[in-house]
Amino acid sequence: MAVLTSRSTDFPRWYQDVLAKAELADNGPVRGTMVIRPYGYAIWERMQAEVDSRIKAAGAVNAYFPLFIPESYLRREAEHVEGFSPELAVVTIGGGKELEEPVVVRPTSETVIGEYLAKWTQSYRDLPLLLNQWANVVRWELRPRLFLRSSEFLWQEGHTAHADEADAAAYARRIALEVYRDFMTQVLAVPVFVGVKTRRERFAGATNTMTCEGMMGDGKALQMATSHELGQNFARAFDIDFLGADGARHLAWTTSWGCSTRMVGGLIMAHGDDNGLRVPPRLAPTQVVVLPVRDEETVVAKARQIAAALTDAGLRVQVDARPGLSFGRRVTDAEIKGIPVRVEVGPRDLAAGNVTLVRRDTSEKVPVPLAEVATRVPVLLGEVQADLYAEALALRESRTTDVATVAEAARAAQAGFARIPWRLVGEEGEAELAEEALTVRCIQTPDGGIPEAGSDADDLVCLIARSY
């Protein structure tokens, strides 16, 4: 009997099977909430570490702001509150008494952080002010799906203030490219289209939204991260101004940007196969699992010795010698969890001075001399990383179709992405597509670049797809 539903038979059911069998997450007691299990959280911690290092390299520093936000704060930016109102969780009672003013459970933090950007920004010398926080947020979700859409999720949100529009725009673009795109291509091994959102899809209160869009294994799009230029909308609402070098007061220009645990769902759907997860080595909490074939003292001792050598080589290694579990069961567990490389240690191989290396992505088995394990495994991990990216890129290229009409785009987007000149779609065509549950995922320049904010050049193209 198959452990997992086949992806080709029922992709949504397969996704749920992987969540359960790989021990990634479970449903929480309140509809729309989730429990992230230790292995799922270990993957998220690896994502955090990689993204956080890139955020810090871009000059931002971490801080933390309150979970509860006065309702009046949200009302100070009209478009923002209108965009989030249907998703808000509002607290009206505290300590057994009705609150004088209801407080909103953080859906995003532009408003509360805006209050403190105003407090901390006095002079042009204080700018740019570049902040980030790792937190949980609540957006009441009517159609929850673990990691993809949940009422509470974990994320990072960056918020910055700048002295001029050009600096703010350049920084928002830098985050989209040097933080998000770099992480997704270099670590997550998911190729992404980076472009701007249409006015219809733009973040509430933003003047421009940049997005990273990945193609999942079923051809649907997943928004992996966004970076927003907020213009002076929030600066005006929260009095974020400063004394300029010219001696006059000026409003600041602000940005916000974020990615979330939704990326764990993207990892599953972009790389998973009928045997479970396939985790890229640069991301994997455990890059190598060493499996003794038999529960014999000499075999287990050699497995631990090999693991120690691989750990000394800088790899993340686990020995699975759990008593009472067959070798086959331990292999299945390693496959479902997507550990990139297995080192199988058996008495016959040891007698010949070898072990067997097994790639999770291809199931290819290679006998390797014991003396070469510590040098061969890192090379193999590099090959797995590159091949997973190449496979995802090949899928995207094979399922992205250039079309010339909105009707053709609607047909092509049933199986993948449709690419079409934006001038042939426009807001009218976008509304037509919405009736068929299709969206314009992003607008790009002809060479796949990010257009300048507000550009209406005739040669812009857009990507249309079904989405999560």
From Swiss-Prot:
It is found in: Cytoplasm. InterPro entries: aa-tRNA-synt_IIb, aa-tRNA-synth_II, aa-tRNA-synth_II/BPL/LPL, Anticodon-bd, Anticodon-bd_dom_sf, Pro-tRNA-ligase_IIa, Pro-tRNA-ligase_IIa_arc-type, Pro-tRNA_ligase_II_C. Keywords: Aminoacyl-tRNA synthetase, ATP-binding, Cytoplasm, Ligase, Nucleotide-binding, Protein biosynthesis. It catalyses: tRNA(Pro) + L-proline + ATP = L-prolyl-tRNA(Pro) + AMP + diphosphate. One of its GO terms (biological process) is prolyl-tRNA aminoacylation. GO terms for cellular component: aminoacyl-tRNA synthetase multienzyme complex; cytoplasm. SUPFAM superfamilies: Class II aaRS ABD-related, Class II aaRS and biotin synthetases. One of its GO terms (molecular function) is ATP binding. The keyword ATP-binding applies. Its main location: cytoplasm. Its EC number is 6.1.1.15. It holds the Pfam family tRNA-synt_2b. It comes from the Bacteria. Homodimer. Consists of three domains: the N-terminal catalytic domain, the anticodon-binding domain and the C-terminal extension. Belongs to the class-II aminoacyl-tRNA synthetase family. ProS type 3 subfamily. Catalyzes the attachment of proline to tRNA(Pro) in a two-step reaction: proline is first activated by ATP to form Pro-AMP and then transferred to the acceptor end of tRNA(Pro). This is Proline--tRNA ligase. The gene is proS.
